[in-house]
Structure formats: C-alpha cells, structure tokens
C-alpha cells in the first residue's frame, strides 16, 4: 500500500490494500467527496439500492462511489469475514469498481455492542461530485490493531487477546500510527481532518490526552462509537476523513 493509484472512472486516488477495501481515497482536483449517512442502518442489499438511486440522482456514475461505512451484528471469525467480504465485493464488481481484483473503495465495518443491526448493514457511504475551488477531500479506511498481510488476524494483531489498560493503549498507538501513515501517503495530516472516529468498548480516557489529543488527532473533536472491530479478538479501530459535504438521508428503512 505504498503506491497511490488513480481510479479515473470515479475521479479519485486510492491506496491499494486488500481485496475487500483500499487504505484510503482522495478526490481528484475539480471534484470533492460527499458523505451521506443513513439515519438508521440499512440492510446491505437495500443499502446498495439506495446508494444507486442517490448517486444517479446526483448525476454521477456508480463508479463515483469511493467509501462505505458498515455495521454488523457481531464480530466475524476469519472464515466468516472472508465469506462476507466476497458477497460485499460482488456488488462493487457489478458496478465497475473492481479492476483486476484491485478494490479502490475505502471502508469501515464495525459491530455496535448495544442495539446492533440484525444483519450487516450500511451506516454511510461516500461518492465524488464535481466541485470548484474546494480544499482536497479524503476518507481513510478503518483500521484495527492488526497489520494487513497473510495469515490470520490473530497472528498479526498487537497483543492479541489482551484487554488491560496498557494493552489497549498499545493497540491505539499502533492504529494511530497507521492512520498517520495512510494520511501521509495521500498528502494529508491530522490538521486536514474534519472527522475522527474511534470504535472500541474499552475506556479511552487513560490515553486520550497524551496519545490522541496531543498528536493533533482531536482538533475537530472525536466521535466515539461503542462498538467492536469486525473480527473476533480485535479491540480498537479508527478511521478519519477531511470533508466539506456531510448529509443525512431518510431513504430506506432501518435494519431491525
């Protein structure tokens, strides 16, 4: 994920990563990224239908979709996560978003601890729109405390299975570093963010000031979701974005 690629059909750059998502996206000059959040989680199939309608109503091609934020009922096993990802990616392929098995779409996928959806659902999505004289906009994919690569997530996770205050701090430090790495590759930093989100059921207060605020990650505040990363055994996830347009839609019914 060290080389920034271009996805011309969508008018954005991206950081190549794994087959189910990229590391982050940034709009081309002359375009910006718009985020649309569903008021309530929408089941995956219905969500894709809603996204198709919203994007087409905006006069944009489906290839303009550049990020998805998902909510799942509970953390997956490695095998279950792989099966879910294959189903999810199938729609992206139909929309012309996957080229030679390279996925340019950013993503986060987390599991609310309280009142989760019954099925995997959409929380929000992003797509590019034409824009004049706006600051560059971007979305960084969610990352937990496990490096991308081969082998199981448990083999790659920071202090896997540990939930002490010290372990959660170390996991957070790793994830913050990964956010900074992805931001830097796309030409951004914390000062460019307008939203930073944390996903964990563990207490962040012991390291909030010195690990998060002090490094500039909370300049626009923080949104803490009481949720788990999408894989069993992972405890801490973050994502971030720098956007001007952030809307809420009432299209589609809730996933309950």
What is the meaning of each model-derived region?
Residues 185-234, 248:
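Accessory, usually C-terminal, subdomains that scaffold auxiliary metal cofactors
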Residues 27-37:
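Generic N-terminal amphipathic, Lys/Arg-enriched alpha-helix
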Residues 2, 6-7, 14-21, 35, ...:
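Extended repeat-based interaction scaffolds and adjacent low-complexity, acidic/S/T/P-biased segments
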Residues 108-133, 219-256:
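C-terminal edge-of-domain segments
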Residues 78, 82-144:
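Aromatic/basic-lined ligand-recognition segments
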Residues 47-72, 77-87, 160-192:
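Short, well-ordered alpha-helical segments
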Residues 148-165:
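A solvent-exposed, charged loop/short amphipathic helix patch at secondary-structure junctions
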Residues 71-76, 111-114, 197-206:
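Short, internal active-site loops enriched in acidic
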